[in-house]
């Protein structure tokens, strides 16, 4: 399984790293998605590419390994979209609450301007950041974990609401367990919990994942619409997840 950095970094999957072309392809893809009336979300891995695609992103995520990164917190402070910070890989939520507080403030730092020139950037702060529970040494999507996380948010004088990542450590990296996770989340919501406002699910058209090594494996031999990174649930299971969550939202509205 190829741990690639994404479409922008190596768009042709051949180690040519045509980042310039990757930016164009990614931007065109996002334009087409937006034209369909669909909001697009993205994880922000670096602090430069958002200048080229940020206007087409409605929601962004900062990963567990970069939530502590000062430059990513500065980036989040200037993005015109809600940003989710994941808890640490050990399950520590404090690094995420610290990140939210840091991103809510204005910052000054070196970055690039929309024309690609180096510039001194001043941000106003982003009041729309939140925590994403992705599990740690143990899963943290269950009701006691959600309650504990919301208590920590309240103690940090932040809104006690959050998003849950159904994959990664919450699914023990078993993609099909995402259905079990969403059922538990739906049960909490159906009882009236308003602490959970969203979920992340690793989903694709075809379930599972396929092995791929750039420079070794043939790109043309890849199976269409199946992940080459993390294993995902397929289209049919994705529909089940959406239906389960939809019913939970309806039940919550009646409480």
Region spans (language model):
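Cap/lid and interdomain-hinge subdomains that line or gate substrate/regulatory clefts
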Residues: 30-48
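Solvent-exposed alpha-helices and their adjacent loops that cap or buttress functional pockets
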Residues: 33-34, 76-77, 121-125, 155-156, ...
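Active-site beta-loop-alpha junctions enriched in small/polar residues
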Residues: 43-47, 88-90, 134-138, 167-171, ...
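Conserved small/polar residues in nucleotide/adenosyl-binding loops
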Residues: 1-5
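Acidic, His- and aromatic-enriched active-site or binding-groove loops in soluble protein domains
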Residues: 10-26, 31, 57-83, 105-114
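Hydrophobic faces of well-ordered beta-strands that scaffold small-molecule active sites
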Residues: 40-43, 83-85, 129-133, 160-165, ...
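Catalytic-face loop-and-helix region of soluble metabolic enzyme cores
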Residues: 163-240, 245-250
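Conserved mixed alpha/beta catalytic, RNA-binding, or beta-rich assembly cores of soluble enzyme
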Residues: 94-184
């Amino acid at each position: 399984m190829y741990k690639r950095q994404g479409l922008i970094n190596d768009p042709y999957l051949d180690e040519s790293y045509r980042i310039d072309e990757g930016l164009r392809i990614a931007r065109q893809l996002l334009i087409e998605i937006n034209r369909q009336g669909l909001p697009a979300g993205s994880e922000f891995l670096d602090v430069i590419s958002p200048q080229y695609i940020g206007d087409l992103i409605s929601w962004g995520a900062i990963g567990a390994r970069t939530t502590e990164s000062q430059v990513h917190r500065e980036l989040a402070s200037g993005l015109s979209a809600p940003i989710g910070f994941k808890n640490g890989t050990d399950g520590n939520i404090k690094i995420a609450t610290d990140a939210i507080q840091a991103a809510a403030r204005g910052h000054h730092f070196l970055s690039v301007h929309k024309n690609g020139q180096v510039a001194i950037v001043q941000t106003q702060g982003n009041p729309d950041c939140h925590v994403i529970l992705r599990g740690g040494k143990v899963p943290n999507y269950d009701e006691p974990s959600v309650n504990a996380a919301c208590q920590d948010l309240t103690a940090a004088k932040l809104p006690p609401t959050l998003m849950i990542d159904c994959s990664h450590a919450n699914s023990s990296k078993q993609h099909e367990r995402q259905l079990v996770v969403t059922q538990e989340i739906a049960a909490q919501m159906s009882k009236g919990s308003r602490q959970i406002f969203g979920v992340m699910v690793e989903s694709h058209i075809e379930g599972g994942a396929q092995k791929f090594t750039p420079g070794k494996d043939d790109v043309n031999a890849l199976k269409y619409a199946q992940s080459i990174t993390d294993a995902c649930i397929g289209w049919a299971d994705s529909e089940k997840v959406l239906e389960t969550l939809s019913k939970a939202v309806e039940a919550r509205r009646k409480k």
